[in-house]
Amino acid sequence: SAQGQDFMRF
């Protein structure tokens, strides 16, 4: 959510 890496939360 910070820079568009919401998919990297895992």
From Swiss-Prot:
One of its GO terms (cellular component) is extracellular region. Expressed in the CNS and thoracic perisympathetic organs (tPSO) but not in the ring gland, midgut or abdominal perisympathetic organs (aPSO) (at protein level). GO terms for biological process: neuropeptide signaling pathway. Coiled coil: none annotated. The modification Phenylalanine amide is found at F10. It is found in: Secreted. Keywords: Amidation, Neuropeptide, Secreted. It comes from the Eukaryota. Transmembrane segments: none annotated. Belongs to the FARP (FMRFamide related peptide) family. FMRFamides and FMRFamide-like peptides are neuropeptides. This is FMRFamide-like neuropeptide SAQGQDFMRF-amide. The lineage of its organism: Eukaryota, Metazoa, Ecdysozoa, Arthropoda, Hexapoda.
